[in-house]
Swiss-Prot record:
It catalyses: tRNA(Met) + L-methionine + ATP = L-methionyl-tRNA(Met) + AMP + diphosphate. GO terms for cellular component: aminoacyl-tRNA synthetase multienzyme complex; cytosol. The gene is metG. This is Methionine--tRNA ligase. It comes from Pyrobaculum islandicum (strain DSM 4184 / JCM 9189 / GEO3). A motif ('KMSKS' region) lies at residues 331-335. Keywords: Aminoacyl-tRNA synthetase, ATP-binding, Cytoplasm, Ligase, Metal-binding, Nucleotide-binding, Protein biosynthesis, Zinc.
Amino acid sequence: MAKYVIGSAWPYVQTVPHLGNLIGSVLSADVYARYLRFRGHDVVFVSGSDMHGTPIEVEAIQLGVDPEEYAKKMHQIVAELFKRWDISFDLYTHTHSDTHIKFVQNFFLKIYNNGYIFTKEEEVPYCPRDKIYLPDRFIIGKCPYCGYERARGDQCENCGRLLDPKQLIEPRCAICGSRPEWRITKHWYLDLRKLEDRIRKYVEENPHLPPNAKEMSLGMLKEGLKPRAITRDNKWGIPAPFPGAEGKTIYVWFEAVLGYISAVVELFREDAGKWERYWKDPETKIVFFVGKDNIPFHVIILPALLLANGEGYTLPTTTASTEYLLYEGDKFSKSRRWGIWIDEALQLMPPDYWRFILIYIRPENRDTSFTWALALEIINKIMNDDVGNYINRVLTFIKNRMGGVVPPPGAPTREDEEFINRVIQLFKKAEKHYDAIELKDALHTVVEIAREGNRYLNARAPWELLRRDIEVANAVMYRAYWSLKTIAAGLTPVTPRSAAELWKMLGISQPSWDEAYKPPTPGTPLGDVRPLFRKFTEEEVKDMLKKLEELRSQRASKKYPWEQVLL
């Protein structure tokens, strides 16, 4: 049994996540965590709401509300939505907890005392109209690398490059649109130059990093790591703990990534020191799930912080980074109301349908697009015709024609043995894909088992065999039933509710991954059999989209984001 810390990128809670945010981090992490637990591993799965930083502060200023009130209300909503999506966090917390604040301040003081932090005066943008400094998302402009018109002061969300506000072309205040002036202020910097060689070694020698994470990180290292300011002039955030840093806060990205540690500290707060058995054990496997725009902070910044701290933290095993999920071929956009957000999705279909669809099209190696035409095809042809139909064919036949209990192994032919051997080989292939965090390929392989099963039933025709050779019919249905155990196991991480129903139908009360490898027990009574999934028509989809627009219109008049969420 191995020990794992699984973390999904902490969502900003200025709004609820959309489907692209979900598949890029939280849902993918949940599927992997569920798989590992099902295999019997020791898993701690944590995340939380990113409460600080400019997105919240900008929105709060524009609405005339206190940032803390705003963030806490949105945190409660997002936490509830994740429960409704069946996300199996061991702890979903937030970055304004006492545990996190104290941990971050102590962590950075240690880095400061180790000599990796220095101070420097610099010119920073200031809005004379709003009378505030403009760090990060308070300032926008054209990206100097890709030309994107709304790049932020800390990062371009289009190309993913980390930026400095001075690099922006035609910068302007994100609140009022005014051109900023530049003022001298003092900030505290993490000297990444001192850590560059060790970071390069970590990236180059890490066999687990996906190609996009390795390529982006090596590109940054090739350019040379520059010192990064870790303080801001924001009012909303964690107060910087350094001598003379009164009025400064820790830059949100430098403190949020430490949440993966502070969340484990909080989880085990009743057992002092237990968290160290996860984060300071070199045998622990630490895996993060992020979208590709978060790669620099998880593959460069967090390892740098852990090394600079020097207290024996285990470096992350890998960062499972996806490409982008598009909606009908275009990027999700709140302002253009383009896409589907996770509260809206649950008004349209149960979570297992969404979970299956999103994992089936997970953007592992390239950007992929959610389209309703594709969603219908996945639901109707794959979930129903391939998987659901095969399950129903096997179980209703055993229920109606074989007394409702698992038949004996019978007298198998070579064809029957070849079938179950093929099923086990496919299941092993799915297992390897899950182990490699190739979740899409794992699910596709589970579907292939069902397709093999449908072909097998058509070829063997047990309804005919039953009339002339009961032993051969038993052999066929015994192995068909066995194949359903592999499907149930393979679906358990992806569609937990449906998989739980399938295990009940199979008459198995204590399911496990290894159960799929075990020959069935003859005489096991089946549970109640019913169709696992249902089909949707094009008309139903049209009705869903119409309902979605009606719900959005009703919410458009609401002033505050927490009033606009569908619960």
